[in-house]
Amino acid sequence: MTATDTHRAIDAVWRIESPRLIAGLARMVRDVGLAEDLAQDALVIALEQWPQSGVPENPGAWLMAAAKNRAIDRLRRNQMLDRKHEELGRELENRREEVTEASMAHLDRALDDEVGDDLLRLVFVSCHPVLSTESRVALTLRLLGGLTTEEIARAFLVPEPTIAQRIVRAKRTLADKRVPFEVPRRAELAERLASVLEVIYLIFNEGYSATAGDDWMRPGLCEDALRLGRILAELTPKEPEVHGLVALMEIQASRARARVGPKGEPILLLDQNRAQWDWLLISRGLVALNRAQELGGLRGPYALQAAIAACHARAHTAGETNWSQIVALYDELARRTPSPIVELNRAVAVGVANGPQASLDLVDALMGEPALANYYLLPSVRGDLLKKLGRFEEARSEFARAASLTNNARERALLLERASSLGG
């Protein structure tokens, strides 16, 4: 294996192993920031040694052993003599690992026994509500996604120093607030889980419909969010909304190839070539949706949105779509989590089921909603309805307004093209 091949292997190992490595270390040292530093130290050692010695049989255990030994050395060097660190130092000293194949195999088995609980703790800490939404997203992608600061910055079109500052501030806040490395108690589990799901779906949505930049989609973010969702579903198998979110992301991701034209232009749902949809992802999404439904209880917002996505997925042509069922699902979603955006989406479904005038009446009733004042999809939807009603001049004005409100270049180009197609 060449040095280049080894470095590629190390990158792949790091992306897979870093979340459980950081999670295991965080449990040991009780500090997420220190845990990441130790994991990075282990990575540096691997980069130095593996090109000569080769990638070990149990790379995750090797990295954990190296990181634990590094923790002992760091504690000694910093002379942390208070009782807590003395106890921690003795605990780690008792666990000091000689990096041999036998010890790595033993450690790998031990990690497998504890990795689920540790990962779940890391998920909840990374998405803790004491952090801002931006910090939660950045920290989650860094600690659980294995992304570098540069990769996160590139994905969100944000300067790298900005992302670095968010991550540093997040780790400092967790330490200052003494956020425990634990799974929340039952009384607060629902609220904390909602925060986790929000972060994962924010990551997915930024990949699925980029809010800014020159690309309409950033598939890498969708893949990162899907991977995090699948991991969470394995760790919390009895939480229906987790399976609902996974179902929603799987089904939406299935359309990725069909959503973008050969020149990068957006292709709207009803215009997509459904033969290009990924039916493996659809089947996985339907399985996850069934799992959410089997667990019972009130359907949450993610499960309901997944059920709506499933209506589209089950229709082999746009004409086969059961729009009445979609309207009914939006009715339920509006009762469960009322919001102007849900009402706007419901109005779109009503327009297909009952005609554009019925939809326009609903959309016009939303025109005064403060939450939609600068939301580009409101004039975009209204423009589409006005066009169908033959009110072309008004439609052109609405498409132009929508174009002025979006920060995505592809979306803007599509809206301006729709406006220009109406003359004037």
Identify the residue ranges that each predicted region occupies:
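A short, charge-rich alpha-helical start-of-domain segment used by transcription regulators
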Residues: 2-23, 33-36, 190-198, 202
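Amphipathic, Lys/Arg- and hydrophobic-enriched alpha-helical face
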Residues: 14-32, 45-49, 124-128, 209-212, ...
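Short, small-hydrophobic-rich alpha-helical interface motif
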Residues: 25, 35-46, 66, 170, ...
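Σ70-family region 2.3-2.4 aromatic/basic alpha-helix that recognizes the −10 promoter
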Residues: 43-47, 57-86, 91, 171
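Amphipathic helix-loop-helix modules that constitute alpha-helical solenoid scaffolds
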Residues: 78, 86-134, 142-151, 158-331
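"A position-specific structural signal for the A-helix of alpha-solenoid helical repeats
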Residues: 245, 249-252, 305, 309, ...
